[in-house]
């Protein structure tokens, strides 16, 4: 039924044709069940395991690898001779990588689907209904409830469907609907129509929503929506419809994959076309098809070389290390890619209750009467320290601590707070914190009594459990609570009737009252000044109300409660306690004692975190279900708004936002920093508008209502104390529910991205080198310098270790003084592309050069000519060009070993280059990142392992090298450091952003100035090695003069 909240009880009952006392007939139930179905959220039809596995292979990079593996497998099948077994290694390793990748992907997908299933925990199992087949209430399965059913609910029940209240059977009905609306306190319900058809859920005071809990009272109602038509069902539909946004890094890698696939395709085709003339060479037995297949194999090797197979593993490792560091800071990351996304967060949309505030109501101000002279009076105003439920804090007057037992008015005020109260404090030993038992407002009063300690109770030596209610217990021993007059909407107060535990002539029964100031003070005829009772005058009343109004609308926007007593109440026998309409008569002729002002206080550390966000160019937006006045006041206290800042067009309620046209809504999201009284749909809409401005949005939430927006935003952040739905829909969970933890996580995310950039560039330059190597080999007609299994080893193992170690580079000191990076900023800029292309070309040329050196100039090598090397496929006994050359020499493992050793060594040098993007190695020596030094040593050890430990040389088709050959490897590899140092110098002095090329006027370029900051231990360590390497003769020059 649409807009049931706007209809009268009679209209709603008439719509369903039902009588409140008898309920639906079985025939009606059957028809309604057929029309509306079961009252449950349908199980999400998850993807099958096969569908999930297939989905993992939709990534372009993965498809290229899969194609390469399949082709390699087919080619290996037709391989002949000794190479048959080794030929299968390559496709097997590639498939192993892909399977591991798919397993991780499927596992993450399965986790994501749990979010929707977690909603089921809010579905009640049973419900109490009236139906015509029985005269009394009956318990049935909640899923069998239909629209039109008459339902009974009472304290402790979970609401089984969306219900329009028809009658309340207790004094009041309180409902905890925080999981749905985010309201921090339970809500009082009534049965009157709410005429506004556009009312938000918080304002539908005559409705109960499925999955919420009854905090107090008993009522009857008619079901108006079941299953997916309930408010919680709509959230489920929204979650199902919400597509998970890909993180900026995932998008970058997708783009990189596309570009790479195009480049690979072009190069593979080019290599194959270049060699068409060689298809009929004698080595292929004169068969054009065999020649075509041979060069197709080379093209496949090229594809393997071009794909950075180690990249996914290195990224995962770096992100995983980042998550461990974040977990130590109480940020538990559920989705690895979101670690990097945190680094470019530009907007944080934060919940108020529990995140920016403690979600622990505390009394921070109170007053009692000091003096009354005629129509004027003065007040004793006090402030209270401590902003949690811990009974630790002091009462201050004029910024000095006071002893509360010295003020009679405070003793009576504490007595009212302790007795007119059904809540308590409890120490949770597992968590090590004090928690509320009962209502937040009443717990704040319980905590106040503990801080006041009006009877000077000895508290030393008490355990934390005993300490929780020590002072309250002393007061409760003095008087016995006989009965309670529950809160009602008409009088806006509640009271307790108490009798002394030790009756005497002076001590009599009393009624203690607390409630909304305007309701209580209107019924006060007297005021308490010290221990005397003085008549209330209009002037005194005006003074009291002006202070209360100031507290309620000032910078704190306190929630005020007036406290009063009835010194001579009627006897219990004279009262009619069955009818709550009479309660207001018994709560008249009251004596005003004092007033307390409370709030859900901001966390102490939040203000500094908001300031840090502003420095880092991150906008903080508060989004709350609370009212606008309170929200703006908290914003001012924590620095989202300035103390006197005009909040027009910067703060909106959900209703005000809805009344704007779409373009005005979009404009509002661009400028606003506070949204109050919002519904779940508003949060999702705000995220959409922010995303339309290319903002990277982090959204916090803890309730079921937050789940769709958490899923839609780039970074969904759930509270550790939040619902399972919110946690499973999020990328990150805050173990301590603290806003400051988000800021720490953003800082960590920025550091991780900077390091990730370094190792991605390092790996890509390595792959460029491998591509250039194979392309040059094919273009020059040389024998294979590197084979696919060797390339896989380099990409996955020897390159992977230093790349992972680059993730340990220390973060920049000014990392939170820079604006968020643009998520569209390319991983590799034009200059960097040139730089790594240049390095890559050198790597490729050096690798091919090392193999050529062995053929042309090495001692113990065949010493063939360049022509013979580039036409080796024409080598046969009757060819005069190859007279005296053993054709088997072109299949020797030595040149391949030289090429692989140069590739590995040059990549280790390249890892040192990646220690800093633009800083020289002379100023930033390798031991700045000790993990990098360790990983380089480990990589080289693994390379020695495959060279010198049988049977690994056979698998990799290589052979051990002697000292002269290793010196040659070093000669060819070390120049890459000099080359990159030159490029860094250009970047530092001419291309660095914001760098002005101005000649310093004050500092002459003396020797000391030029050598300032150089690490001399590094220079002294490296110079002897370089001199020794280049002074040893290895016939290097012979290669060029042969």
Swiss-Prot record:
Q: Where are the transmembrane segments?
A: 49-69, 90-110, 254-273, 296-313, 757-776, 787-807, 828-850, 897-916, 930-948, 964-984
The ranges of region (Interaction with TMEM64 and PDIA3) come to 788-1042
3'-nitrotyrosine carried by residues: 294-295
Q: How is its activity regulated?
A: Has different conformational states with differential Ca2+ affinity. The E1 conformational state (active form) shows high Ca(2+) affinity, while the E2 state exhibits low Ca(2+) affinity. Binding of ATP allosterically increases its affinity for subsequent binding of Ca2+. Reversibly inhibited by phospholamban (PLN) at low calcium concentrations. PLN inhibits ATP2A2 Ca(2+) affinity by disrupting its allosteric activation by ATP. Inhibited by sarcolipin (SLN) and myoregulin (MRLN). The inhibition is blocked by VMP1.
Q: What EC number(s) does the entry state?
A: 7.2.2.10
**Entry-linked SMART domains:** Cation_ATPase_N
Topological domains on the Cytoplasmic side lie at: 1-48, 111-253, 314-756, 808-827, 917-929, 985-1042
Q: Which residues bind ATP?
A: 353, 442, 489, 514, 559, 624-626, 677, 683, 705
Q: How does it sit in the membrane?
A: Multi-pass membrane protein
| Obligatory cofactor(s) | Mg(2+)
UniProt catalytic activity: Ca(2+)(in) + ATP + H2O = Ca(2+)(out) + ADP + phosphate + H(+)
Asked whether the keyword Oxidoreductase is assigned, the reply is: no
Biological-process GO terms, alphabetical: autophagosome assembly; autophagosome membrane docking; calcium ion import into sarcoplasmic reticulum; calcium ion transmembrane transport; calcium ion transport from cytosol to endoplasmic reticulum; cardiac muscle hypertrophy in response to stress; cellular response to oxidative stress; ER-nucleus signaling pathway
Superkingdom of the source? Eukaryota
According to the UniProt record, where is the region Interaction with HAX1? 575-594
Question: Where's the active site on this chain?
Answer: 351 (4-aspartylphosphate intermediate)
Task: Mark the residues carrying the PTM Phosphoserine.
Answer: 38, 531, 580, 663
Gene Ontology cellular-component annotations: membrane; ribbon synapse; sarcoplasmic reticulum membrane
Chain positions with Phosphothreonine modification: 441
- What is the UniProt domain comment for this protein? Ca(2+) and ATP binding cause major rearrangements of the cytoplasmic and transmembrane domains. According to the E1-E2 model, Ca(2+) binding to the cytosolic domain of the pump in the high-affinity E1 conformation is followed by the ATP-dependent phosphorylation of the active site Asp, giving rise to E1P. A conformational change of the phosphoenzyme gives rise to the low-affinity E2P state that exposes the Ca(2+) ions to the lumenal side and promotes Ca(2+) release. Dephosphorylation of the active site Asp mediates the subsequent return to the E1 conformation. PLN and SLN both have a single transmembrane helix; both occupy a similar binding site that is situated between the ATP2A2 transmembrane helices.
Name the family the entry cites: Belongs to the cation transport ATPase (P-type) (TC 3.A.3) family. Type IIA subfamily.
The protein's name in its UniProt record: Sarcoplasmic/endoplasmic reticulum calcium ATPase 2
Species per Swiss-Prot/TrEMBL record: Sus scrofa (Pig)
